[in-house]
Amino acid sequence: MRLNTLSPAEGAKHAPKRVGRGIGSGLGKTGGRGHKGQKSRSGGGVRRGFEGGQIPLYRRLPKFGFTSRKAMITAEVRLSELALVEGDVIDLNTLKAANVVGIQIEFVKVILSGEVARPVTLRGLRVTKGARAAIEAAGGKIEE
């Protein structure tokens, strides 16, 4: 067997449809587009969501909600992710340096998910009740 002798299995490949190449092909003249109408023309077709002039669904339904700008700069950090940070004191800058949170994040809340293996000091971060208990049980502390 050589690379130049390899070929697909018989029947594995289908020949492409050759549209508009004579009546004998079955796809001649109109090329499978039927007669006249918007969809038969070049560039023909309607935009997404168009319902023939009827008010489309996306306009019949009311607008709702908004995107909180604070949510874009807030992140939750699991207890297990604190192990990725070097050093005993953890604050926003050390979390960013360890790539635990993104550069644009300004507010962080530590949540109870996973375990904290070593005593750490959290500085300037918000902490849930469960996470606070787990950190203090491991010998760590939380500074405001």
Curated annotation (Swiss-Prot):
Family matches, as HAMAP family: Ribosomal_uL15
Pfam families assigned to the protein according to its UniProt record, in alphabetical order: Ribosomal_L27A
PROSITE patterns assigned: RIBOSOMAL_L15 (PS00475)
Example GO biological process: translation
Keyword RNA-binding in record: yes
Subunit structure: Part of the 50S ribosomal subunit.
Organism: Buchnera aphidicola subsp. Acyrthosiphon kondoi (Acyrthosiphon kondoi symbiotic bacterium)
Entry's Gene Ontology cellular component terms: cytosolic large ribosomal subunit
Protein name according to UniProt: Large ribosomal subunit protein uL15
Keyword Ribosomal protein part of the UniProt annotation: yes
Keywords: Ribonucleoprotein, Ribosomal protein, RNA-binding, rRNA-binding
SUPFAM superfamilies: Ribosomal proteins L15p and L18e (SSF52080)
One example GO MF annotation: structural constituent of ribosome
Similarity comment: family membership: Belongs to the universal ribosomal protein uL15 family.
Gly residues composition bias: residue spans: 21-31
Region named Disordered: 1-52
Domain of life: Bacteria
Biological role stated in the UniProt entry: Binds to the 23S rRNA.
InterPro entries registered for this protein in UniProt: Ribosomal_uL15 (IPR030878), Ribosomal_uL15/eL18 (IPR021131), Ribosomal_uL15/eL18_sf (IPR036227), Ribosomal_uL15_bac-type (IPR005749), Ribosomal_uL15_CS (IPR001196)
